[in-house]
Amino acid sequence: MVFILWRCYTRPRLEVYRFGYHYYLSQLIALLVLAPLAIVGIRGSVTAGTRPITISNANQFVNRPVESSVVLNTPFSMIRSIGKKAFVTPDYMTPEQMEATYSPVHLHPVTDGGHKGKNVVILIVESMGKEYIGYFNRSLDGGRYKGYMPFIDSLLTQSLTYKYSYANGRISMDAMPSILSGLPMMVEPFFLTPASLNDVDGISSMLGREGYSTAFFHGAHNISMGFSAYAHSIGYERYYGLDEYCKSPKYGGMDDFDGKWAIWDEPFLQFTLDNIHDMKQPFLATVFTASSHHPYSLPEQYRDSLTDEGGQPIHKCVRYTDLSLRRFFERASREPWYRNTIFVLVADHTNQTSHDIYKTDLGLYSIPIIFFTPDGQLEARTDEVTVAQQTDITPTLLHLLGYDKPYLAFGDDLLDEGRDRGGYWAFSYNAGIYQLVKGDLMLQFDGTKTTAVYRFKTDPLLKNNLVGRLPEQQPMEQFIKALIQQYMSRMNENRLLFNS
């Protein structure tokens, strides 16, 4: 038996393989082919305007966030979330103290109802910092400053707006959760965290349950920035992006693409009106513009008439967007639904700045928030006391529309007549510093202690740090601690709905 086994089994022997140039050439070709494919697979697209896909993109293909696990695979989820514990719940106070100090739950919302059943159009205007608008800056440059948005200047004379209004974030992907769901950016953009798979409500889902038809419009590639996924997750019925634009025979398709991000604002806003015209009333239509953005280019027909001015390349693009908005409103004003509509105009964030007042830690968040009703039912005025922020937009619209059901939002109804005007606040986060604006004070908190307090209304350049010298510091610090703890705990425990 041993002899047979010895004869039948192959005896091991050393063999030396020599690879010729064919082998190395084939491996090089394989690398050159597979490496770009791997990069495209990781990014999700080859276009510059598309961010690498993340776990929140799964929301685009499911009806509820809880179903996202069917779309996601384990290795991808691990790669995208490993080492990303963005939300760590602090232990500043007991849950009871936290609830008593601050709660995002609007249990018994005060409503107006005088605008009940009206349509809503929300225009999120790319990079429309308050510095670009002459209406807010009449004293700049010795009173000579005119800004770059004359149409917005004219609209503001017919609108409700705020002298002290702020963005909650510094990039575009921070804006949608803030404006449409009342969720400010804290530590990391919501889209990029595992919490993006939480159950989230939004003005679209709330109005959808009241019988509104809903649509979201953005002229970039449909998977760009995760906008379509988030819009789907908060209940928008239809999404119109570059794909839908290119299917319309009425427009120029990719000839209207800016070469980097999206369809130029002017044609895309007209395309938006075409589709709003076909929506069943009442409707909620949300539009996110794109042209006032790096690389600061213009459609060919405007390159001679709109030239560089004011020292910043974005200024000519802001003028183009202003012109596009003018033509949007000129055409919208001829629609039968126009006078029965509430328009909201708000920036996603600020951009290039020229004046020192807009280069401060607060000025970098200074944006317009504008409510306009063509029928004049909402009083046109500039509120010079109330502090407003992006997360206040959903509660304020719900007030106007008579929505009286409980909901959750990290913002307030700006039109609550029973509210002390000095009690409104705005929150932002940047590079490890939490920032709270309330009354006439701005407080900066590093997660452990207050590092700065400024009277920003009388010290707009934030030169006089009053930390440790004001009695208001302690209650403001307690408030921001409760706000942070509420946000972190709700993110980690998937409690972003009222009934959760």
Describe each region flagged by the PLM:
Residues 2-7, 42-43, 74-91, 445-447, ...:
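Juxtamembrane/interfacial segments around transmembrane helices
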Residues 1-72:
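Transmembrane and membrane-interface helices of multi-pass
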Residues 376-500:
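Membrane-interface soluble catalytic domains
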Residues 49-408, 418-423, 430:
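Soluble catalytic regions of membrane-associated enzymes that act on cell-envelope
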